[in-house]
């Protein structure tokens, strides 16, 4: 979780701030001193509470809407809340069981990512988002080449996670079917189980050492592999539940909502934000302007990386209003990241 420079608050001010924010998150209405006097469990007068709330407003943790006598948290107030005041509520046994069952029924990486994003959305009631692993992180299991015409070849790649990619390539010269078969057999025999990022470098290294007829086979392999095994321009991210934000009271400004949905549609900026968190251990929380994206000024993003095979594969998270139930969403994201990573472990290591 991101560290921040929280103001020094005495225990009474911390308790009132926690109570006010928790109640505002629950009800969505500004909270006044009388309400806090009734529900905070402190033996102090409403006048004393008003003075403390005024102090919290002076240091930027609360604000007073013009139409209400109550107060609401600012983005800075939410930051202090999630960094030092929130009391986590981990997912219940039934939620964990549902999440595990949904992931277990998924076949292949894309299906797993889709299930994870849908379950995050369903359990948080907001937007679930998962960044996809880069293909070059996966070992390739098998490759076939199918001639399409004089210049084009269909490369069929099967990866260790059972995903299949079809790529139409245009090698430097025309190949006979027998040549394509020979190259495919060589690549499958020598490089099955290796990551894409390793294969081309190995081919070039072996080509420098090769002699005679082996040199020709390797040269053909380099030509075809240079096209077929480059990282593909994948979508990069799976999202679910975007329309859930349309009914959120805090996101009623249509112009701002349109900007948000345009960001959802393009995905590029959100994916860049997720990429910024991929090497950060544990949960990261961006509140409003902390994202650095104008289109996300009115929302919060809770993320965590997921890992398998000892390496970070991607990031998942929840996008929702700043007034979200952080006590539930933060541990939900943590749990989902752990379970998605476990589901993506190679067979035999789970």
From Swiss-Prot:
Function, in words: Negative regulator of class I heat shock genes (grpE-dnaK-dnaJ and groELS operons). Prevents heat-shock induction of these operons.
The keyword Protein transport appears for this protein: no
PANTHER family noted in UniProt: HEAT-INDUCIBLE TRANSCRIPTION REPRESSOR HRCA (PTHR34824:SF1)
GO MF annotation, one: DNA binding
Taxonomic superkingdom: Bacteria
Pfam entry (one): HrcA
Name of the protein in its database record: Heat-inducible transcription repressor HrcA
Protein's GO biological process: negative regulation of DNA-templated transcription
NCBIfam families, sorted: hrcA (TIGR00331)
Keyword annotations: Repressor, Stress response, Transcription, Transcription regulation
Disulfide bond entries: none
Matches recorded under SUPFAM superfamilies: GAF domain-like, Winged helix' DNA-binding domain
Family in the record: Belongs to the HrcA family.
The encoding gene: hrcA
HAMAP family reported in the protein's UniProt record: HrcA
Presence of keyword Repressor: yes
